[in-house]
Amino acid sequence: MKFFALFIYRPVATILLSVAITLCGILGFRMLPVAPLPQVDFPVIMVSASLPGASPETMASSVATPLERSLGRIAGVSEMTSSSSLGSTRIILQFDFDRDINGAARDVQAAINAAQSLLPSGMPSRPTYRKANPSDAPIMILTLTSDTYSQGELYDFASTQLAPTISQIDGVGDVDVGGSSLPAVRVGLNPQALFNQGVSLDDVRTAISNANVRKPQGALEDGTHRWQIQTNDELKTAAEYQPLIIHYNNGGAVRLGDVATVTDSVQDVRNAGMTNAKPAILLMIRKLPEANIIQTVDSIRAKLPELQETIPAAIDLQIAQDRSPTIRASLEEVEQTLIISVALVILVVFLFLRSGRATIIPAVSVPVSLIGTFAAMYLCGFSLNNLSLMALTIATGFVVDDAIVVLENIARHLEAGMKPLQAALQGTREVGFTVLSMSLSLVAVFLPLLLMGGLPGRLLREFAVTLSVAIGISLLVSLTLTPMMCGWMLKASKPREQKRLRGFGRMLVALQQGYGKSLKWVLNHTRLVGVVLLGTIALNIWLYISIPKTFFPEQDTGVLMGGIQADQSISFQAMRGKLQDFMKIIRDDPAVDNVTGFTGGSRVNSGMMFITLKPRDERSETAQQIIDRLRVKLAKEPGANLFLMAVQDIRVGGRQSNASYQYTLLSDDLAALREWEPKIRKKLATLPELADVNSDQQDNGAEMNLVYDRDTMARLGIDVQAANSLLNNAFGQRQISTIYQPMNQYKVVMEVDPRYTQDISALEKMFVINNEGKAIPLSYFAKWQPANAPLSVNHQGLSAASTISFNLPTGKSLSDASAAIDRAMTQLGVPSTVRGSFAGTAQVFQETMNSQVILIIAAIATVYIVLGILYESYVHPLTILSTLPSAGVGALLALELFNAPFSLIALIGIMLLIGIVKKNAIMMVDFALEAQRHGNLTPQEAIFQACLLRFRPIMMTTLAALFGALPLVLSGGDGSELRHPLGITIVGGLVMSQLLTLYTTPVVYLFFDRLRLRFSRKPKQTVTE
């Protein structure tokens, strides 16, 4: 009593306290970062190593395996995957959430150093690492185009000047430059000319290496001067290499230009990048795992004018893709939804109280509670994101509940003739415990979420804490500011109603009278209500088992990613043509704004595309509908497949795949894996629950298998080392020398001129110089025949692995797909030597599925414990919790009605309903207990009177929560796919709960009382008119 009086009789102090809360909130709001979702990125580090010309199997055994054995010893590694392709190995390390990325990077570098002695000596450079997840979509893509500069020159500008500067920007984790390679001097050899001159490829390599050296020459000194010695020991351009003497034949000099075409070109000619049908260099920028995407993008944009000045005017630098506009638009939509929710909630209060003066009170208390929450969010290190803003939107209905309960009870005393200050004190005292019970039991719902681990726990923690803080501030405001304003603003007389509102008042009275009559009937037919209650419990179980489930709603971020997978024997020239064809099909779609893509590198038969869609208000279709439309057009392109998926804000794992979900096959027996993977993939491709089924196992690449006759080689004076060196020199784009320039280092690349390697007859033109100096054709000691070979070798841990990726067809959920895959694996009878498991997002979904029911039970148990402590009773909490089954049925039926799967967002809605719907029962039980203790009423009369007296605040709080959530259901635009499941769940649960709990709660209350009476042998009582 004294606590409430302290604030009611000291209005200045109470107002200043509220102003202080508001000012802190405004300050926190201005400093809060902006993000699409809470920070849930796993720390990921990518290790890269190269050995030009080495086969995928060689890279896997000699490079990947030694590195994996060393890296696998690092503490906190939750997953390690690797992929080895032609001349390249990439190892992805995913760490536990709590692992510091910088500390992990130091451990990775130490592990690389430890494995260095086990790696091949011919590697051109040491393995390197990057603190970025290569499977994440870039946060920004920049393109360089020019009508004047070559692709190699553009790549040089990008990698030498732009990429290092961008990499230094806070938040940037990796800048991947694609579309070409660094400039190089390329030496294209003529095999016939070499044979005629008696010059071997090793002779050419040695001559070039010896002619281009950079060594210290020292200095000369006399008594007074010192001269630095400088020589022309370096060759820098193709024109300087052309006249180089590489051999003497019959006394005549054989120059490099006599046996080769020397050009200024690029290191790897098998790379291509494009933007909107124009050749381009791409800078794909990814953020650090812990970085804020909006801040990082803003920092990059601020740096762009400076970057533009560092490159020639003839080079056009453009932003091809930027993730931030969609994120900003989504947050603006949520902010608008929040404002609408506040307005609707205040409208509900006005309609029920029919007093402008009384409506001002919640109109002040609600913003104070919400704005004050921003200060706590800032102190907790949170961000303004879709989930935290949705928490505030939902909190609108919660925070007004406390004010409504206090305000309505004070208004009732005023209408009875009590003086304002006395009514404020008495009314607050009567409902203070009720408000405290509602708030604490609501916060208790979120305690299991705060203790939940893994990605779901990290994702939901910010939502739970934000909502809990808002409820806590609301509790403080409703017991301080609200009664003070009631005492000083409201009048003792009954407020005058506007004529247009009298009809609503009469309707409310009629509704209350009708409820009273129906309640009397129900209380005399309790068995029927008991059956209904038991039926809702059973229906909950059935609906939860049968409803489709998924991990997270499929987002429309306005960005699509496409992975191209062509025939495994396709040439680079044909693959570049496929890229152009696919880009044209997509570019012609009316919903597409921009298309960029690239192909080449170590995987000639694959490519990537990044598609920016037009803003949401400029297109009528969702991203998934656009994918469905494009899938039909793309299927007509022969010889290649393009798999499209919408970029998501949440992506788990480091695997680069062509679809959103993955199923990984592991085996210690590589032969068994290669036997069963095609069978499993073909089976999964027939399932209607899956779409775009593809695999990263590519073991049907074309290979030319050479078999050496070692006896003949020994007789001819040729060793295997010389033969292998010949092949590497001829076909491996061998980097044989380095050109040092002030800004970068460039390579001299040697191979047989592509004009002489158009078919397998090129092998017949190759020869080796034996130990007697004679030219021995390759065909003398080797035979060759076509064969199949893997284009990539993949590992997970240290086991051979193959990952099957898939998307979901329209109308199918992840639970449908998971169940179908499990059935297919059982039907196929896959041996125990091949193990299958879901990976990435699908794996997290499986883990979340196993914990959802436990989480809901834990929330209910926590609420029961809190209520039991507050009421000092084992029974009354059960009465209050009896409201939950009807809310669950309503939520699940609403999801089914709107064809929305049960996701993590819907789970949040269920948890919220546990907190919301019990408020009705708390208000009933509190007043019934009070009436029994002080009014000398029977339990039946007490609960009946409590239901009637609390009917208006129950209707007000329920409608306030309903109208607070309704904008989430009705909102459109960016990010609406996240808001809809939450709104649908809450609205459906509230509607069903309101219809049933007004009757089931008093029946359950009397049921437990009759149990008490039966044990104490008291006579049964009935309700009288």
UniProtKB/Swiss-Prot annotation:
Its main location: membrane. One of its GO terms (molecular function) is xenobiotic transmembrane transporter activity. GO terms for cellular component: plasma membrane. The keyword Protein biosynthesis does not apply. The chain crosses the membrane at residues 3-23, 333-353, 360-380, 387-407, 431-451, 463-483, 528-548, 853-873, 875-895, 897-917, 953-973, 984-1004. InterPro entries: AcrB_DN_DC_subdom (IPR027463), Acrflvin-R (IPR001036), Multidrug-R_MdtC (IPR023931). It is a multi-pass membrane protein. The keyword Cell membrane applies. Pfam families: ACR_tran. Keywords: Cell inner membrane, Cell membrane, Membrane, Transmembrane, Transmembrane helix, Transport. Gene3D superfamilies: Multidrug efflux transporter AcrB pore domain (3.30.70.1440), Multidrug efflux transporter AcrB pore domain like (3.30.70.1320), Multidrug efflux transporter AcrB TolC docking domain, DN and DC subdomains (3.30.2090.10), Multidrug efflux transporter AcrB transmembrane domain (1.20.1640.10). It is found in: Cell inner membrane. Part of a tripartite efflux system composed of MdtA, MdtB and MdtC. MdtC forms a heteromultimer with MdtB. HAMAP family: MdtC (MF_01424). Belongs to the resistance-nodulation-cell division (RND) (TC 2.A.6) family. MdtC subfamily. This is Multidrug resistance protein MdtC. It comes from Shigella sonnei (strain Ss046).
